[in-house]
Amino acid sequence: RDRAFSIFYVGINLGAFFSPLICGTLGEKLGWHYGFAAAGVGMIVGLVIYIWGQKHLAPDNIMKEAAGQAKPEPLSPDDVKKIWALVVLCAFNIVFWAVYEQQGNTMALWADANTDRMILGWEMPASWFQAFNPAMIFIFTPALTWFWAWQEGRGREPSSMAKMSIGCVLLGASFLVMLPAVSSCVGGGKAGMGWLTACTFVLTIGELYLS
């Protein structure tokens, strides 16, 4: 189930990869009216696909029939422990996504103001850094899927809760990567792109473990 969801996760990140390249480039080069207009067109296309694809969804009565057959039973002590463990992990999950979403603001501002984006005399748009995360999801999801299958074959695949815990640890580690970059900017200097790329890499692996 975890591996199947990871494959699905690659699909939903397709738009996240192309949107910074298209909307960000239009916004930075031509004006943000063009960038937001392109985003609006993309949202309309997504809505059309969603409405068109509804015919492939299972009818609602399946869930209603299943709910009618369910018989509530009292929770066992083991069930209570699992629920409390889930509550704790949900709390960490909230923190994870709150910090993760810094990609769209704090890290974007860092890329714009404190990162040397010159490549052979060409300056890469700061918004393109937003495409790094989904690109890494494309690249590393198959590798992690294979790794988890390899672990499962040896009876050592972590549980879903263990994976979420690993993801939270990697989240913290990703921002530790930026400490040397911050030091290099003292006095008005700019950090190399490698630091932000490395931070995004560790953050992405953590995201895949948690998601």
Enumerate the predicted regions with their spans:
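Intracellular loop-helix junctions on the cytosolic face of multi-pass helical membrane proteins
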Residues: 2, 6, 23-128, 143-156
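Hydrophobic/aromatic residues within the transmembrane alpha-helices of Major Facilitator Superfamily
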Residues: 14, 48, 94-98, 135, ...
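Hydrophobic alpha-helical transmembrane segments
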Residues: 123-138, 197-207
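A gly/Pro-rich, aromatic-decorated transmembrane alpha-helix motif that marks the paired
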Residues: 14-29, 176, 180
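Central cavity-lining transmembrane alpha-helices of secondary-active solute carriers
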Residues: 17-19, 45, 131-148, 173
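Intracellular juxtamembrane helix-capping segments at the cytosolic ends
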Residues: 1, 5, 208-211
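Transmembrane alpha-helical cores of Major Facilitator Superfamily
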Residues: 6-14, 131, 135, 169, ...
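C-terminal transmembrane helical hairpin of 12-TM major facilitator-type secondary transporters
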Residues: 161-210
